[in-house]
Regions:
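NAD(P)+-binding Rossmann beta1-loop-alpha1 motif at the extreme N-terminus of oxidoreductases
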Residues: 1-46, 50, 54
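Residues at the starts of beta-strands that form the adenosine-phosphate
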Residues: 20, 105, 132
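Conserved short alpha-helix immediately C-terminal to the canonical SAM/SAH-binding motif I
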Residues: 29-30, 63, 88-91
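Short, well-ordered alpha-helix to beta-strand connector turns
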Residues: 40, 52, 78, 130-131
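Rossmann-like NAD(P)-binding element
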Residues: 46-82, 86
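Rossmann-like NAD(P)(H) cofactor-binding subdomain of soluble oxidoreductases
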Residues: 69-121
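Internal alpha-helical scaffold of NAD(P)-dependent oxidoreductase catalytic cores
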Residues: 125-212
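Interdomain hinge/lid region at the active-site interface
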Residues: 195-243
Length: 243
């Protein structure tokens, strides 16, 4: 995927390393832009996929799981696959057995960076500078794999790696990311939002920066993390009631 996350990965890799980048996106216009600006060297195809040494899957959780299942037979046993999805329990539980079956290395990941806009046109080569890269290794993860990924992500400008279980990731992300988007989106639904001109400043801008959501993507993320997110919503409602 070459949206905000995948596109920024591609641009960062091309600008900060000597690696060859192959990319794929369902949007033909995105593919054209990616090639024209040099974010990718060539399209990722079934012909060159077996040669890929590191595969970054930057699409929605359900689509990521399906893509790996469909393409697993083509992935080299010496390759490393990292998903970049915003939830980890469902993704890791689905992809890890496939990776084990076909013999390639897999680890769940989540770059802690983003913008209020999505898509390739919003992607930048410096999106990950100073950010944290979350990885979810398990007891079978080879330490040499972690060292390889650490060097790779530091080259892209990440400040460091954060290690977590899928469960811990989803529990904390429900608070630090998902809840924040819900609060921002709910906040701007007040009728007064239409009458704010001349009455708003920095605090309003801060509260509303991430109010516009990609409905399909965020619905999937919210539903995959329903238990932890519901708990955080209940906690917030309780504190609002206190006020």
């Amino acid at each position: 995927g070459l949206g905000l996350i995948g596109g920024s990965m591609a641009k960062s890799i091309k600008n900060r390393t000597a690696h060859t980048v192959w990319g794929a996106d369902l949007n033909s216009e995105t593919m054209t832009m990616a090639r024209m600006c040099g974010a990718i060297d060539a399209p990722l195809t079934e012909e060159n996929l077996p040669q890929a040494e590191l595969i970054l899957v930057a699409i929605r959780p359900g689509a990521a799981i399906e893509w790996v299942r469909q393409h697993a037979p083509l992935i080299s046993k010496s390759a490393i696959l990292v998903d970049l999805c915003g939830v980890k329990r469902t993704v890791v539980a689905s992809i890890a057995p496939v990776a084990e079956q076909y013999g390639f290395a897999y680890i769940g990941g989540h770059p802690m960076a983003g913008r209020e806009r999505g898509g390739f046109t919003a992607s930048t080569e410096d999106l990950y500078v100073g950010a944290s890269m979350i990885l979810t290794p398990d007891k079978r993860t080879d330490m040499r794999l972690l060292e390889t990924l650490k060097a790779f992500f530091l080259d892209l400008g990440f400040a460091g790696l954060t290690f977590s279980t899928p469960e811990e990731h989803d529990r904390i992300i429900a608070f630090t990311s998902q809840l924040a988007h819900i609060v921002s989106s709910a906040y701007v639904k007040s009728p007064e939002a239409q009458r704010r001109r001349g009455f708003s400043a920095g605090s309003f801008q801060d509260m509303t920066r991430v109010a516009r959501l990609d409905e399909d993507m965020w619905t999937e993320l919210f539903l995959d993390d329903e238990d932890f997110l519901t708990k955080e919503l209940d906690e917030l409602i309780g504190h609002l009631t206190d006020y």
